[in-house]
């Protein structure tokens, strides 16, 4: 019953988010029509639909860059240091040597992301507002400035899209900057968790662990449930995977799967993948595996070219299907996809999992001969 209620709440939340986006879009459209309707109507008569569509596509990409650039500028102005900048699936990272490199990374539910290393954490004095607000402020201000300088139909498309993107990020909803600002403004716990997440990401990009996070977390009680505090769950799961405690991974991931259907999409997908991996290894007869493979979120995730998806499928084909050959093919695929891991630490962990599975599979092949 609790799981059904959670699912109902999650569906209502998604519908509420969609309705709010539609209302914001309608409000922006009405205001634009009221102030600029007659002028734009005259211009539209002489404009190609193909050009307008191309303008929309280019404007979308530009506003993702502008949005993440706003986060970058806001962070630099308040003591943050650059870690990575992602637009769609193309990611620019700063290496430990100080150089830069490009690589591919897909993160469900996000068009881009600018991650930075925060300044040293000080209770009540942790800067977060300009870093978080920089994105939607950049979208809105750039849009207004552009249309003021060049008031034509193409810039109108650019400006309208930017204002809409800015407002839907500024108004607190689900998993956006406005919601982050609201959560951090209300709670020091959330501010501490954001600091830990950003600092941990900095070290993960260098292939190193950040054990200080456990010291920070031991000093507080996680008594809030939101997409910031939910991130701390994955620290425990990552540690268990690294230690090869796959039964404990199964137990914890299954508990979260059953109790937390309201998790944001990227988190929910990661829980589904981890549960498929651990259930396949530890409980290949579990009927839950079939349910997992029918979940649209997991189906979509397994299509992305990431090494952890290939290792999960290798575990499934080996233990559930008894198909060693296909399992080894997935492991070979996982090796090729290692550069697409979230960060260097995740890449190294995934390489260890591949070695572990390969050793088990090869031993099974030898015993079968």
Please name every model-derived segment.
Residues 54-118:
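Small-residue-rich helix-interface/hinge motifs
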Residues 111-112, 117-208:
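Hydrophobic transmembrane alpha-helical segments that form the core helix bundle
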Residues 77, 114-119, 173-260:
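Polar-ligand-bearing catalytic/cofactor-coordination segments
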Residues 45-65, 154-167:
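Membrane-embedded alpha-helical segments that form the functional core of polytopic membrane enzymes
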Residues 238, 242, 261-313, 318-322:
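Alpha-helical adaptor scaffolds
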Residues 1-56:
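Topogenic membrane-insertion module of multi-pass membrane proteins
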Residues 211-222, 246-260, 283-300, 323-335, ...:
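Alpha-helical repeat scaffolds
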Residues 267-279, 307-312, 343-366:
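TPR/TPR-like alpha-solenoid helical repeat scaffolds
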């Amino acid at each position: 019953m609790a799981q059904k209620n959670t699912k109902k709440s999650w569906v209502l939340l998604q519908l509420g988010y969609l309705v709010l986006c539609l209302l914001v879009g309608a409000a922006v459209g009405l205001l634009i029509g009221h102030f600029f309707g007659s002028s734009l109507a005259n211009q539209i008569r002489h404009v190609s639909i193909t050009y307008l569509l191309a303008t929309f596509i280019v404007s979308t990409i530009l506003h993702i860059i502008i949005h993440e650039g706003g986060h970058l500028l806001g962070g630099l102005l308040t003591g943050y240091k650059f870690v990575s900048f992602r637009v769609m699936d193309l990611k620019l990272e700063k290496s430990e040597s100080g150089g830069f490199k490009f690589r591919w990374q897909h993160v469900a539910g996000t068009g881009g992301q600018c991650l930075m290393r925060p300044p040293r954490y000080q209770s009540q004095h942790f800067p977060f507002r300009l870093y978080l607000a920089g994105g939607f402020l950049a979208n809105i201000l750039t849009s207004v400035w552009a249309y003021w300088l060049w008031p034509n139909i193409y810039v109108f498309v650019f400006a309208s899209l930017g204002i809409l993107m800015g407002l839907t990020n500024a108004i607190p909803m689900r998993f956006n900057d406005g919601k982050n600002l609201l959560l951090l403004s209300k709670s020091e716990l959330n501010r501490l968790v954001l600091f830990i997440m950003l600092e941990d990401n900095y070290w993960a990009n260098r292939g190193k662990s950040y054990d200080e996070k456990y010291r920070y977390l031991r000093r507080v009680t996680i008594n809030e449930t939101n997409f910031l505090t939910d991130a701390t769950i994955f620290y425990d799961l990552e540690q268990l995977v690294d230690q090869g405690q796959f039964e404990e991974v199964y137990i914890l991931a299954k508990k979260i799967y059953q109790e937390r259907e309201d998790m944001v999409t990227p988190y929910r997908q990661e829980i589904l993948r981890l549960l498929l991996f651990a259930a396949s290894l530890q409980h290949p007869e579990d009927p839950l595996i079939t349910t997992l493979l029918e979940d649209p979120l997991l189906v979509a995730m397994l299509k992305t070219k990431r090494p952890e998806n290939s290792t999960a499928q290798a575990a499934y084909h080996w233990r559930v299907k008894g198909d060693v050959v296909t399992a080894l093919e997935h492991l070979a695929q996982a090796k090729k996809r290692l550069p697409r891991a979230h960060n260097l630490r995740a890449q190294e962990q995934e390489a260890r999992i591949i070695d572990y599975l390969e050793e088990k599979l090869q031993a099974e092949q030898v015993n079968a001969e």
